[in-house]
Amino acid sequence: VISPEMVTRSGLRWYKNRVVVNYDMDAKNLLKAQPSDSEDGVNKLLTMSYVTASRLLLANSFGTLDSAHVYKLSRIYPFHQFARSARPLDAFTADYPRVYGMKLTDKWSSLTFFNEDEEHSQKIAVRLSGIEGHGGAGLQADKRYYVYDFWNDRLIGIFKGSDVLEQELRKGEARQMAVREMESNPQVLSTDRHLLQGLLELSEVSWNEETKELAGYAELVAGEPMRIAIASNGWNPQSCSVSDAEVKCSSEKNSEDIVKLSLESARGGKVFWKFSFKK
């Protein structure tokens, strides 16, 4: 199991070195994750191990795990290799941290809400433009941001940088979110491949104004579709294409402004993709 005290002790070490790697040899058992009556127990254990410890010592052999457990476990691998960890954003405004943030680029942050209560739901909030460490996420007040929920695979909404983001979390839930500055052209919001939602599995993603194409590279797992959530931002999605004829490429409109691009390869590996749009 992973207790609230364990998460707190590990997370607060950020303020010693600004980077946290916890070498505690207490292995984590996915089959005993709490709460046990929903997927939130396993999701929480994996999320908070990644966010506050930067490693996971697994107690289970793969022979004891079903395909659903293995799939969830693979959402936190690989661990990122650069020297940066999530910061407890409410470290000095709460009894213990429930909000963690990590700047990935100047326009993109990772945000984690943690409900330590395994019996009751709880509202958790952060001021998006507030001071980091004092209850804020340090974003720009004059910008607008998409917030996308990883485990629940949904767009939470579009927020002003001056807004307070408040969410009601289920009992024992850890909600992992990507916060991306809103652009005028189509943009990637998230993927279903990794907890950091595009940082490790996607590269060189850019918008070509001349060809009206969003393009980039994706690192695919053999036999597993990768779904990329894209905000069309007022543009109409047209067609997708890939550099490898053996890679399947398809798309479907998920909502009025969100389209899902799906890539699948039998052998895996890196593939170049592009997705065309028109006004």
Outline where the language-model segments fall.
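Glycan-recognition surfaces
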Residues: 1-67, 93
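Aromatic- and carboxylate-lined catalytic core of secreted/periplasmic carbohydrate-active enzymes
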Residues: 46-91, 174-190
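Carbohydrate-binding surface patches
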Residues: 49-52, 57, 92-139, 178-180, ...
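Extended hydrophobic-aromatic, low-complexity segments
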Residues: 60, 120-124, 156-159, 167-168, ...
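Solvent-exposed beta-hairpin/edge-strand motifs
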Residues: 130-153, 230-246
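C-terminal beta-strand-rich structural cap/linker in extracellular carbohydrate-active enzymes
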Residues: 158-199, 253-279
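Extended Gly/Ser/Thr-rich low-complexity repeat segments
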Residues: 225-239, 267-279
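Low-complexity "stalk/linker" and mucin-like segments enriched in Ser/Thr/Pro/Ala/Gly
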Residues: 245-253
